[in-house]
Curated annotation (Swiss-Prot):
The keyword Lyase belongs to this UniProt entry's keyword annotation: yes
Species this chain originates from: Synechococcus sp. (strain CC9311)
Record family assignment: Belongs to the aconitase/IPM isomerase family. LeuC type 1 subfamily.
Gene transcribed to yield this protein: leuC
Name listed for the protein in its UniProt record: 3-isopropylmalate dehydratase large subunit
Record: residues binding [4Fe-4S] cluster: 347, 407, 410
Bound cofactor: record note: Binds 1 [4Fe-4S] cluster per subunit.
Cofactors named for this entry: [4Fe-4S] cluster
InterPro entries attached to this UniProt entry: 3-IsopropMal_deHydase_lsu, Acnase/IPM_dHydase_lsu_aba_1/3, Acoase/IPM_deHydtase_lsu_aba, Aconitase_4Fe-4S_BS, Aconitase_4Fe-4S_dom, IPM_dehydratase_rel_enz, IPMI_cat
Catalytic activity: (2R,3S)-3-isopropylmalate = (2S)-2-isopropylmalate
A single BP term in Gene Ontology: L-leucine biosynthetic process
Keyword Amino-acid biosynthesis: yes
Keyword annotations: 4Fe-4S, Amino-acid biosynthesis, Branched-chain amino acid biosynthesis, Iron, Iron-sulfur, Leucine biosynthesis, Lyase, Metal-binding
Length: 468
């Protein structure tokens, strides 16, 4: 059993009661909601005559269904308009802050909460969204929940949970130039599999993690769920504090000093006992690209699609399915695979540093003929910051479209979708069949810099080969 870990400390601080069957009633410090998984929860709440227990601990935004080209109301899609209108009514009725379009604070829920200083070390964070693990980058314990659990948190500000095991993933050395946190987490999922983390929290640690920016740590924790982990986290350190200082909702003055002292104490003890520990050499990781239909089917850009003989027998059936669906041949080099669409954005990679990395590749180059390439900032704040630095013009000059914030082509819940058998180079988090809107569309996951490299060449390319 793990002992002395950050996970243990945060768990113990938020325990309300031990329940029959071995679960624990856990206080939720921050509840994030959006337009997709909250409507049914509010209906269920009102059917029972209940009110939102802690509206001050509940924060809303709109992200999944918003168009990224024309955000004028009413939306062209009547269902999207109804979903947003419903969220607006529910938030108004229950006194919940809604960061709506044009507020200067709207964006993808897992982008705006950190930039507003809402996510802080030692918190428990819940949201009706799979990628809530993003917030673990701050030393929080954060997890996605279903609609019925959204109802429970609205009603009680608590949740019945089973305690997880804690696996520490230690990364020696440093990532090489042209290799990013996205490559690191795709490498982990490739190495361990998409189910390895079931029943676990992942603690990411080691010299390579210490060197990551907060935005890269968010990318890392965002995709812990794709490796089966319920949550992933990084111990809070000076990098965390430097990011948080001065943001709204964060303590200031003397309270700031007290907060940072307490936050430091939450880090896993030097003698912490983990249920499991695995080590990786960050220096050996290459830019990574998925070739199949799960995030675990990834390879280095300088590798070939694996043959069935190279795979574990248990992985061969899904590989055979992936070969057929993706129209890829075992042994085929992933570099050189042509793409149709290039998407930079999502809660995984829609932050300012992501856009800077992609813009560095796009600057002075042109999107290849026949390629549709577009950039969707993760929030209104990201968009305005990028525009202030001229990144939007860099992308436009290169032939990319510059869009308004939203989840966009990460998922098929808004107008940004693949068509037919199009294949996309995408900085998002899932490459499942149909994920990007077309039942036969294909997705190659990679870092924003790699997406930009694919956009200007027209095919999967090693960003390191393009130089400055």
């Amino acid at each position: 059993m793990s002992s002395g870990t950050l996970y243990d400390k945060v768990w113990d601080l938020h325990r309300v009661a031990e329940l029959s069957g071995g679960s624990t009633q856990l206080l939720i410090g921050l509840h994030l909601i959006h337009e997709v998984t909250s409507p049914q929860a509010f209906v269920a709440l009102e059917d029972k005559g209940l009110k939102v227990r802690c509206p001050e601990r509940t924060v809303a935004t709109v992200d999944h269904i918003v168009p990224t080209t024309n955000q004028a109301r009413p939306f062209a899609d009547p269902l999207a308009e109804e979903m947003l209108s419903t969220l607006e009514r529910n938030c108004s009725k229950h006194g919940i802050v809604l960061n709506g379009i044009g507020s200067g604070r709207q964006g993808i829920v897992h982008v705006i909460a950190p930039e507003l200083g809402l996510t802080q070390p030692g918190m428990t964070v819940a949201c009706g969204d799979s990628h809530t693990s993003t917030h673990g980058a701050f030393g929080a314990i954060a997890f996605g929940i279903g609609t019925s659990q959204v109802r429970d948190v609205l009603a009680s500000q608590s949740l019945a949970m089973n305690k997880l095991k804690v696996r520490r993933l230690w990364f020696d050395n440093q990532l090489s130039p042209g290799v990013f946190a996205k490559d690191l987490i795709l490498h982990v999922i490739r190495s361990l599999g998409v189910k390895a983390g079931v029943g676990h929290a992942y603690e990411f640690a080691g010299p390579a993690i210490d060197a990551l920016s907060m935005e890269e740590r968010m990318t890392l924790c965002n995709m812990a769920i794709e490796g089966g982990a319920r949550c992933g986290y990084v111990n809070p350190d000076q990098t965390t504090f430097d990011y948080l200082k001065g943001r709204p909702s964060v303590p200031s003055g003397g309270a700031w000093n007290r907060a940072t002292r307490w936050w430091r104490s939450l880090a896993s003890n030097a003698d912490a006992v983990f249920d499991d520990e695995l080590r990786f050499d960050a220096a050996t990781i290459s830019p990574t690209v998925t070739w199949g239909i799960t995030p675990g089917q990834g390879i280095g850009v300088d590798e070939q699609v694996p043959t069935p003989e190279q795979l574990d027998p248990a992985d061969r059936p899904i590989a055979e399915e992936a070969y057929r669906y993706m129209d890829l041949t075992p042994g085929q080099a992933i570099a050189g695979v042509p793409v149709d669409v290039c998407f930079i954005g999502s809660c995984t990679n829609g932050r300012l540093s992501d856009l800077k990395a992609a813009a560095a590749v796009a600057r002075g180059r042109q999107v290849a003929a026949g390629i549709k390439a577009f950039v969707v900032p993760g929030s209104e704040q990201v968009a305005r910051a990028a525009e202030a630095e001229g990144l939007d013009q860099v992308f436009r000059d290169a032939g990319f479209e510059w869009r308004e914030p939203g989840c966009s082509m990460c998922l098929a819940m808004n107008p940004d979708r693949l068509e037919g058998r199009q294949i996309s180079a995408s900085s998002s988090n899932r490459n499942f069949k149909g994920r990007q809107g077309s039942a036969s569309g294909r997705t190659l996951l990679m870092s924003p810099a790699m997406v930009a490299a694919a956009a200007v060449t027209g095919y999967v390319s090693d960003v390191r080969s393009l130089g400055d």
